[in-house]
Regions:
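Metal-dependent nucleotidyltransferase catalytic core
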Residues: 1-13, 21-34, 39-77
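Short linear motifs in intrinsically disordered/low-complexity regions
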Residues: 4, 10-13, 86, 104, ...
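Conserved nucleotidyltransferase catalytic core and NTase-mimicking acidic/glycine-rich helix/loop elements
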Residues: 96-223
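Conserved NTP/Mg2+-binding pocket subregion across the NTase superfamily
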Residues: 48-125, 222
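Generic hydrophobic, helix-prone segments enriched in Leu/Val/Ile
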Residues: 5, 62, 93, 178-183
Length: 223
């Protein structure tokens, strides 16, 4: 089915390029029923390539710009290359929409510290469930910060291990520790994670976000 669409797209002057995204785009986590998720970049929308319904073997949609895609969808396009790019513009736009400004890492860093702080405070007064939920909520904020601080978009959870293995960050990410935090809200693990995160934050120019947590920094550092 993809071959048929590509043959049409190559002959169609309205088409600029075609991108296969998701699991097919990476060749990862595929199974017998895996569908093809396709975006066709066109000069003008006509609906010619839009799938009539969801759930088929191939689901295609037309856009005039990849920048029009919803933000939640963008991790599906990281580490993919166009299967058709008549002008080179599609590859350039792919690189642009999956790039993250490291300056934006301050917000998820602050969110991470807030969740860790709440977890530690709740644990101290015996609110076990609240402490666990806050610990779990801290993890996506931590990952958002870590990837954004290095100019990258956090992957979907299903691709996290693959991405760290195939495209590692320049800092270690202890996934076993993250799993322990999510399952047990262990404060020793949370403290170790905060100390590491503070070091990364200061090294990459986000020390002001950490300093804004005074006078609670001593508590956050386990003192």
């Amino acid at each position: 089915m993809l071959d048929t669409l590509l043959a049409e797209a190559r002959e169609d002057e309205n088409v600029i390029g075609v991108v296969v995204h998701g699991s097919r785009g990476r060749g990862l986590h595929l199974h017998e029923g895996s569908d093809w998720d396709v975006v066709v970049v066109v000069r003008k929308r006509t609906g010619r390539y839009d799938s009539a319904e969801r759930g088929g073997e191939l689901e295609a949609s037309e856009v005039t710009s990849l920048a029009d895609l919803p933000r939640w969808m963008l991790p599906a396009f990281t580490w993919t290359t166009p299967v058709l790019d008549k002008t080179g513009a599609v590859a350039a736009e792919l690189a642009e929409i999956t790039r993250v400004d490291p300056a934006t890492a301050a917000e998820p860093l602050d969110d991470y510290v807030n969740s860790y702080y709440r977890s530690a405070k709740n644990a101290r007064v015996g609110l076990g469930l609240a402490a666990l939920l806050d610990a779990q909520e801290s993890i996506p904020h931590y990952l958002d910060f870590l990837f954004a601080a290095h100019g990258r978009m956090r992957p979907y959870n299903k691709w996290l291990e693959w991405e760290l293995r195939e495209h590692p960050l320049p800092v270690d990410v202890d996934l076993d520790r993250l799993e322990r935090i999510a399952l047990t809200r262990n404060l020793d693990d949370q403290l170790a994670l905060f100390r590491e995160t503070e070091g990364v934050a200061r090294k990459l120019g986000h020390g002001a976000t950490i300093d804004a947590w005074e006078p609670d920094l001593a508590f956050l550092r386990g003192h």
